[in-house]
Every structure is written in C-alpha cells, then in structure tokens.
Curated annotation (Swiss-Prot):
Keywords: Cytoplasm, Ribosome biogenesis. This is Ribosome maturation factor RimP. Gene3D superfamilies: Ribosome maturation factor RimP, C-terminal domain, RimP-like superfamily, N-terminal. It is found in: Cytoplasm. GO terms for cellular component: cytosol. Belongs to the RimP family. The keyword Cytoplasm applies. InterPro entries: Ribosome_maturation_RimP, RimP_C, RimP_C_sf, RimP_N, RimP_N_sf. It holds the Pfam family DUF150_C. Its main location: cytoplasm. Required for maturation of 30S ribosomal subunits. One of its GO terms (biological process) is ribosomal small subunit assembly.
Length: 158
C-alpha cells in the first residue's frame, strides 16, 4: 500500500508547500474493508487550524482526482488532519523540532529497570540520545542508545 503513498506524495507535498504548511506524514491503509489515505499536516510555529485543514483537504481531493492513471483506483476516504500534540518523532525535521522539548520514549529493553521514560530531549545523534529526566527531587541526564528506542513521540508535561 505504500506504493500509493509514493505515487501521490509529490502531488500532495506540492500543494501543502505552496500554502506554507508542512507534510508531516502520510499513510494509505485498509481498515475494516475501507481504504483510507491519511495525510498529516502542520504549520510552524503555532500549528494549523481547522479552516486551513478544510481548505487543503478540498485542494488535495480535487488534485488527486485529476491524476492519470489513477493511483487510487479503489474507493477510499481522504483524511487530512493535524498530527496532534503527541505525534511520533520520525523524520530528521521532527528530531530537530524535538530538541529541548518534552518527549515520551518506549524502549525495547529496560534501562535502569524501566522501559518507558519521559523527559526533555537534550541531545541526539545517529547512535544515541540524551534525555533529562526527573529522578525524585532532582534532574539527571540519561544516555539512551537509539537502537533501543521502540517508539518516541512528543509529550505534554504535567
């Protein structure tokens, strides 16, 4: 199904870029017998509003209908939305944006007897990250190998 995404991504990205927005992610999935093309869009620095999402959805829908040959020959539902405040960190741009931000991390194996951490991302490279975490009444820096990270996403600190 990613072949569909590969075919429509350039078209969708052009429309989104022309409006000063950013394509965060895109997926084409089948759920309960229904195909969905999901497009996640954001705007820096304050996020994207519902009116802009609606306008982009209309433009993307119209443009997708003109592509020949049709990369989406089966019926599908187009969903355009914001990725949300707690979106996954996937791309290099996401990693840059996450620097000095609060994140949630799930690990493949335990470090210091825990598989889940939340804290401020202080540093990253291809091999490891440094996370500042609360340890009772103080803060400490924890170095985590990237190969141990199962999931990482933005998080809201309470």
């Amino acid at each position: 199904m990613s072949k569909v995404v590969d075919l429509v991504r350039p078209v969708v990205e052009t429309i989104i870029d022309e409006h000063g927005d950013m394509l965060v992610d895109m997926e084409y999935v089948k759920e309960k017998g229904q195909n969905y093309l999901r497009i996640y869009v954001d705007r820096q620095p304050n996020g994207i509003d519902i009116d802009e999402i609606a306008a982009l959805s209309e433009l993307v829908s119209e443009k997708l209908d003109t592509i020949d040959p049709d990369p989406l020959p089966d019926p599908y539902v187009l969903e355009l939305s914001s990725p949300g405040a707690e979106r996954p960190i996937k791309t290099e741009a996401d990693w840059k944006r996450a620097l000095n931000d609060y994140v949630h991390i799930g690990l493949y194996q335990k470090i210091d007897d825990k598989k889940v951490y939340e804290g401020t991302l202080k540093y990253y490279n291809n091999d490891e990250i440094v996370l500042e975490v609360k340890d009772k009444t103080r803060r400490k820096k924890l170095t985590i190998p990237r190969k141990l990270i199962a999931k990482i996403r933005f998080a809201i600190e309470f």
